[in-house]
């Protein structure tokens, strides 16, 4: 059928009929969904598209295993799914990721694209559903309520693999920086006030340790994602799914995805509850909370360059101002802060969406997976950019840090065991009021000798457990 300059085909469902552009692979249900949900302007995440193709391929293979699906139809479905996994036809997934219907629109988008491509493979025209139907054949033994959660599990696990690799690389650079800066002494601060000396390497080692815990937490959070509810069909009872099909489809899912997937031991539970996603999201939130704190530290230590702390230098990535010539901003650290705000907000959305489930199904999974996959993706992209464009190039301004240590009254803490708290406090106060150093005041008041102060006020020794100048107390 021609309509103006375009050629169309007509498809029907129980609500009526619609004209579909003849060359597209999606069908009437996808078109209805795209008209109903023009929400975000975003596309379905490519890992979610691939995960849906994996599910459809596994289901076709399992249905052929149990002789429910004719071999010719099944192999055409498998080939169409493989083409999607090769990167083809992704532009045919047009429904908005945020949608009503618990993911039915996304599932039908996959069914129709795979179905119409399979029809072509079999030598038929798109939309000629008498030979192969998106619902009857591509969706055989399935419901959106097991297809969609299973695809969420697979896509999330795939993205987490990439994120964890990026985090391991970032952790390695933090460890390298900790070693590089191990001999660099700086002033430690609590309440943003001078405390006692610390090594810059110790601070970076602390960053590497918290990141190490985050990696471990995220790895552990994947545990329940390996359990899928494929075979649950509508409410977890497995209606219309052959028991042997259920066994085979999980086996094929594991083989195709390369993931150690297993069938959930209670399909009703696995169909109605979404705590596996909130567990992952919580670990991402904690990670970004920690990374944002690190970014705050880096921004503060790099403040200046003339009128701030200027203890470290961050790589200059771009001009920082449209009005102030020469200004450079800590844009990569600021990036981490903003990713943290987004991930923390996404986690709140995921919690609310998980709580909103009712009875046998959580219909809010579309907004849940949209935010979960976004969190993982922006963390992966952000960490990679931060590592390459900032972390690797951080330099220590040793001269500046040495000056701060020498000028600070905080080193009086090392003198405390030798003079007593009250006497040490008087010297500290005088140092703050007069601007003189603790060393000069101790000599001025004749409370310690030059040689004793060399031992007690050795800044490197102050960064290790013990009492500075302990041997002097034992005389």
Swiss-Prot record:
GO molecular function, one term: aspartate ammonia-lyase activity
Catalyzed reaction equations: L-aspartate = fumarate + NH4(+)
Active-site annotation: 321
Pfam families: FumaraseC_C, Lyase_1
TM regions (residue ranges): none
InterPro entries, per database record: ApsA, Aspartate_Ammonia-Lyase, Fumarase/histidase_N, Fumarase_C_C, Fumarate_lyase_CS, Fumarate_lyase_fam, Fumarate_lyase_N, L-Aspartase-like
Binding site for L-aspartate: 104, 143-145, 190-191, 322, 327
UniProtKB keywords: Lyase
Region (SS loop): 320-329
Top-level division of the source organism's lineage: Bacteria
UniProt keyword Chloroplast, yes or no: no
GO cellular component: cytosol
Expression induction: Part of the ans operon, which contains ansA, encoding L-asparaginase, and ansB. Contains two transcription start sites, depending on the growth medium.
UniProt cross-references to NCBIfam families, sorted A to Z: aspA (TIGR00839), PRK12273.1 (NF008909), PRK14515.1 (NF011092)
Assembly and oligomerization: Homotetramer.
Protein name according to UniProt: Aspartate ammonia-lyase
Organism, scientific name: Bacillus subtilis (strain 168)
Record gene name: ansB
């Amino acid at each position: 059928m021609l309509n103006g300059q375009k050629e169309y085909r007509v498809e029907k469902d129980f609500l009526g009929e619609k004209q579909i552009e003849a060359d597209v692979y999606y069908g009437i249900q996808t078109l209805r969904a795209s008209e109903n949900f023009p929400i975000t302007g975003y596309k379905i995440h490519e890992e979610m598209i691939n995960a849906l193709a994996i599910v459809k391929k596994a289901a076709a293979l399992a249905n052929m295993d149990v002789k429910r699906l004719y071999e010719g139809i099944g192999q055409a479905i498998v080939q169409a799914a493989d083409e999607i996994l090769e990167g083809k036809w992704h532009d045919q997934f047009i429904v908005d990721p945020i949608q009503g219907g618990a993911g039915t629109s996304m599932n039908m988008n996959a069914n129709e694209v795979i179905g119409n491509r399979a029809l072509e493979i079999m030598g038929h025209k798109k939309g000629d559903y008498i030979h192969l139907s998106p619902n009857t054949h591509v969706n055989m033994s399935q419901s959106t309520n097991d297809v969609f959660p299973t695809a969420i599990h697979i896509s999330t696990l795939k993205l987490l693999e990439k994120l964890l690799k990026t985090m391991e690389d970032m952790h390695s650079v933090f460890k390298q920086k900790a070693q590089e800066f191990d001999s660099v002494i700086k002033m430690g601060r609590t309440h943003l006030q001078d405390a006692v000396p610390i090594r810059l390497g110790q601070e970076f080692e602390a960053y590497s340790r918290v990141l190490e815990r985050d990696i471990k937490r995220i790895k552990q959070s994947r545990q329940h994602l390996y359990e899928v509810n494929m075979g649950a069909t509508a409410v977890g009872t497995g209606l219309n799914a052959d028991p042997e099909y259920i066994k085979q489809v999980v086996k094929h899912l594991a083989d195709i995805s390369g993931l150690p997937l297993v069938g959930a031991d209670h399909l009703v539970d696995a169909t109605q509850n979404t705590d596996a996603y909130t567990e992952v999201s919580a670990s991402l939130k904690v990670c970004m909370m920690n990374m944002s704190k690190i970014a705050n530290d880096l921004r503060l230590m790099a403040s200046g360059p003339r009128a701030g702390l200027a203890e470290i230098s961050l790589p200059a990535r771009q001009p920082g101002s449209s009005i102030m010539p020469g200004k450079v901003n800590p844009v990569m650290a600021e990036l981490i802060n903003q990713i943290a705000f987004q991930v923390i907000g996404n986690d709140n959305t995921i919690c609310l969406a998980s709580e909103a489930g009712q009875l046998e199904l959580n219909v809010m999974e579309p907004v849940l997976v949209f935010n979960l996959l976004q969190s993982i993706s922006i963390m992966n992209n952000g960490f990679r950019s931060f590592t390459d464009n900032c972390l690797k190039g951080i330099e220590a301004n040793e001269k500046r840090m040495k000056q701060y240590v020498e000028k600070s009254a905080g080193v009086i803490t090392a003198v405390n065991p030798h003079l007593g708290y009250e006497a040490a406090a008087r010297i500290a106060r005088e140092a703050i009021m007069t601007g003189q150093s603790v060393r000069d005041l101790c000599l001025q008041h004749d409370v310690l000798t030059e040689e004793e102060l060399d031992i007690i006020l050795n800044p490197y020794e102050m960064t290790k457990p013990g009492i500075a100048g302990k041997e002097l107390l034992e005389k």
